[in-house]
């Protein structure tokens, strides 16, 4: 009897509510302090367990990423190799989040793949073990696996659960591809923000240390942020290009969205301190 398809596994976007760069390590990675929060805008994945070990990915974004580089397939293969599971999976991705942009979509897709297949394959790894697999694939993946809003330190792997407010956001995705590697290699990037205690960071105004550099190099980001600042406290997420404005009421965010210039793309979403992936995990 063929296996049923397990449907509607969410892979939410994240915002970096602040991002501070505290220095550069000997290995070239940067020491960070950042605050991750999920938003209720998600890619969706479906999974079917197969008896043969092949991993097959169907996507509405076919051709964008080579199979060998696709984080979803790499995550599934890593779980196979770690656990010795000898079956496979057929995976369907409904890509709804902007590619790149600092929303973490690729990392979130990989995290959802690890969490879902660990359940469907009955491989029974702990959350910590899944996060270790995820960290090898990308620094942002563990936060999506743990599934709670988090203060992160180090290269982003040391996580502490936090409960910031859950406001409404207007997110704008400028038509620009910002290379994370280029941002972190740029000599003009500030790398000397003092490390602060979490209580201090949570109570002071929030900022993104990458923002000034990216805005200076990408006029589309500068334009989107300039427009958004007319309506709400706003900043960039990650290394961009996406920017977000913070609103207390959904209606305020929707009213601003209605005025968005036609050449800009945006959407309204609510902050979430618990990932919808965790809610989905508790269902059959």
UniProtKB/Swiss-Prot annotation:
Its EC number is 2.7.1.148. The keyword ATP-binding applies. The active site is at 14, 140. ATP binds at residues 98-108. It catalyses: 4-CDP-2-C-methyl-D-erythritol + ATP = 4-CDP-2-C-methyl-D-erythritol 2-phosphate + ADP + H(+). Pathway: Isoprenoid biosynthesis; isopentenyl diphosphate biosynthesis via DXP pathway; isopentenyl diphosphate from 1-deoxy-D-xylulose 5-phosphate: step 3/6. One of its GO terms (molecular function) is 4-(cytidine 5'-diphospho)-2-C-methyl-D-erythritol kinase activity. Belongs to the GHMP kinase family. IspE subfamily. This is 4-diphosphocytidyl-2-C-methyl-D-erythritol kinase. It comes from Shewanella baltica (strain OS185). The gene is ispE.
